Regions:
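Extended alpha-helical targeting/anchoring segments
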Residues: 1-197
């Protein structure tokens, strides 16, 4: 598939491009249904719907945000960004179209990243995490913050370019529910083996 054709497909609402086991790629298009959880009480029913859909032989692709943690452990403190789903999955009738990615190494990058935290805020939050670790209240923490930058290219082209320059084993492009999510990860966070996630 040519780069232009792939970018056009990624623009379509309901599209998910994800790395498949091995070295291939799968492109999902035209979902039969979307399941979205915007608050903690909707997370468990969304997972039940996911289980029913895939149990009937359907396919699903989507994301679970870190902020969904409170649905599994009410003690987890999270800060949900306004308007961003805790969980969103698209349900598909057919398996993904398998494809090879075209060369997209054209050097499209984001410049002028502006962190949402000042250096002082960053140091304060690191100190707070360290204090919790030393007190034995936690054994690990995911401390992340957003950076913002003006986007001078289409997000689809940015994803393909980043992937060309930074290949990772687990990557995905998600385009539904008003979200265009670019994910390039060296690790797998969730995996199912029959009855267990």
């Amino acid at each position: 598939m040519e780069r232009g054709e792939l970018v056009a497909r990624l623009r379509e609402e309901g599209t998910v491009l994800a790395s498949l086991p091995g070295s291939g790629w799968g492109l999902f298009r035209t979902p039969a249904e979307l399941v979205i959880a915007r608050n903690v009480s909707e997370v468990e029913p969304a997972f039940r719907a996911l289980e029913v859909w895939t149990g009937r032989g359907g396919y699903a692709a989507g994301f679970v945000s870190y902020e969904a943690a409170a649905a599994f452990d009410p003690c987890m403190e999270t800060h949900v960004p306004e308007g961003f789903p805790l969980l969103a999955f698209a349900f598909y009738e057919s398996p993904p179209e398998e494809l090879a990615l075209p060369d997209c190494g054209d050097g499209v990058f984001v410049s002028a990243l502006q962190p949402e935290w000042s250096e002082e805020e960053y140091r304060e939050r690191i100190a707070a995490v360290r204090a919790e670790l030393f007190a034995g209240n936690i054994y690990q923490a995911n401390l992340t913050f957003r950076c913002r930058a003006p986007l001078t290219v289409e997000p689809e082209a940015l994803f393909l370019s980043l992937l060309s320059h930074h290949p990772v084993p687990f990557a995905a492009w998600v385009n539904f529910c008003g979200v265009k999510l670019l994910s390039l990860s060296p690790e797998l966070f969730l995996e199912s083996d029959g009855t267990r996630i």
